[in-house]
Amino acid sequence: MTAKTLEKAPVSLGGFVHPLADSIYSVDELGTTLPASVTIYNDLGGHYEQINAGDGLINGDMSTEKRALDLAYSSTFAQPAGPRNQTFTYMGKFSIDSQYPGNWNPEGVINIVSAGILGMTQPSSASSSPASSVSPSHFSSTLSCTMAQNQADMEHIYSPPPPYSGCGEVYQDPSAFLSTSTCPISYPPPSYSSPKPNADSGLFPIIPDYAGFFQPPCQRDMQSMPDRKPFSCPLDSFKLPPPLTPLNTIRNFTLGGPGPDGPRLPTAYTPQNLPLRPILRPRKYPNRPSKTPVHERPYPCPAEGCDRRFSRSDELTRHIRIHTGHKPFQCRICMRNFSRSDHLTTHIRTHTGEKPFACDFCGRKFARSDERKRHTKIHLRQKERKSSSSSTGVSSSERGVATSICSSSSNQ
């Protein structure tokens, strides 16, 4: 809805019901300046005469002759100093049109009369028929109801802001934003002192709980705002991340906690749970002692008939795959499976043709380091043979010289 006014009114709609001061308009000036259609009544209790307020008369006379009466109004009207002897009538036309021109409401033309408290509603702007005279009490009740309804509708739009005693009431505490249900900040303080053993399996957790280290998203966003006031925050949430899991913890998790007889195997590697098969190719020297002492090899093979012991758990895991036949590494080219990752690496070189290992004597290249080592032994044997043959040749020549000297001396 848009409002069009014919006269500029510097006060709001709520200010029309206030009485005007007598010093603003005098009776003599009103008699000369107001149009003939506006009548000043001296008697408050008398009947009002008929008012002919056509659109053409109001639009023509009120817009031209009323310019001489434009005064600077203050925000509030002053109360009259003395008693009023005479009253006058002030008329204005407010045409309220809807947003679409086709939906014009004929009741949108409102005539507001202040000082005399006279209200009048014309049925249509095109009608110029004289209106019947009505009692002042009826107009007063109609105007009071209309103004009270309009003022109540516009108070929620133009209501002044609530007064604040200080700046602290305008800006809320940042901690109040964190008290919502979408961002809870009450977390139990985590502890990283020591891993808790499990009573059932005796295993230690190797992945710590990082929930206490990372802050909630709402709290992290609030700390990044420079406009907010700083607030106290507990220092427990700024804990340093826990260190990496030590090797002993990983070893205990893989093979179980150490017992009185040394490290024990997990339940998955026990002979009754794994289908351990004997090795098809036995060791070349089964009774040959190892260079590493027994106490430094605490991981024995659980398979029956296998006396192998290892100093590292990953070596034992790799060895157990020989008994179980597990081959987790697969070639993507020929789909062949291998039990060790290094075997898969060397196998892929057969497809690519890569030979990174070269012989130091002849320059021949090999795909595996053990092949180069085996080939190098051939050169070493040949070198030993040459050195042995040369040494035998020198010794035989020396013997021949010695025998010739002895024979010549005997002849003499």
Swiss-Prot record:
It comes from the Eukaryota. Residues 374-384 have a biased composition (Basic residues). Residues 388-401 have a biased composition (Low complexity). It is found in: Nucleus. Keywords: Activator, DNA-binding, Metal-binding, Nucleus, Repeat, Transcription, Transcription regulation, Zinc, Zinc-finger. Its main location: nucleus. GO terms for molecular function: DNA-binding transcription factor activity, RNA polymerase II-specific; RNA polymerase II cis-regulatory region sequence-specific DNA binding; zinc ion binding. Sequence-specific DNA-binding transcription factor. Binds to two specific DNA sites located in the promoter region of HOXA4. Belongs to the EGR C2H2-type zinc-finger protein family. This is Early growth response protein 2b. The lineage of its organism: Eukaryota, Metazoa, Chordata, Craniata, Vertebrata.
